[in-house]
Amino acid sequence: MRTQSLKPYHANYHSLTTNDSPTRVDAPTDSGLISEFVYSENQPVVTQLLLPLLQQLSKQSRWLLWLTPQQKLSRSWLKQSGLPINKVVQLRQINPLSTVEAMEKALLTGNYSVVLGWLPELTEDDRIRLRLAAKLGNAYGFVMRPLNDTKVGSGQCATLKIHSYLYH
């Protein structure tokens, strides 16, 4: 795993900020997306759904970024999962409120095929900022939110989960 700068440079960003007449951006206009995953420790479905997508995205020349304030990725899990250790970047110990900004900057750079961020509940403004950043950076952004398991028994919808032991 490597550490990478989160400089907000994006090849297409300059063309969008100049005073010239609007020009076509190189990345497709439908590119990039943000999805939110609310998961529980009792359901391993997210791992089964998310892992094949991460494996596919790891074939790109870009990085996979994990913004994980509390989890630590395991090298052995990365190997077993078929994810390239040399393309995975992990930033830990980030204040959850700063994680939204870090995720936005990372998506904008275009250096990452996917950015996974463990975030608190997003505001609508946060969602809009992240969607735009993902579109401009032609990247996937996955907002990961653990569900408090005590809510499941009180009528909450079933949710998806990623086992936390995979990250230790």
Swiss-Prot record:
Pfam families: SulA. InterPro entries: Cell_div_suppressor_SulA, P-loop_NTPase, SulA_CellDiv_inhibitor, SulA_enterobact. Keywords: Cell cycle, Cell division, DNA damage, Septation, SOS response. Is rapidly cleaved and degraded by the Lon protease once DNA damage is repaired. The keyword Plastid does not apply. The record marks H168 as: Essential for degradation by Lon protease. One of its GO terms (biological process) is DNA repair. The keyword DNA damage applies. Transmembrane segments: none annotated. It comes from the Bacteria. Residues 106-112 are annotated as: FtsZ binding. Residues 161-168 are annotated as: Lon protease binding. Interacts with FtsZ. Belongs to the SulA family. Component of the SOS system and an inhibitor of cell division. Accumulation of SulA causes rapid cessation of cell division and the appearance of long, non-septate filaments. In the presence of GTP, binds a polymerization-competent form of FtsZ in a 1:1 ratio, thus inhibiting FtsZ polymerization and therefore preventing it from participating in the assembly of the Z ring. This mechanism prevents the premature segregation of damaged DNA to daughter cells during cell division. This is Cell division inhibitor SulA. It comes from Yersinia pestis. The gene is sulA.
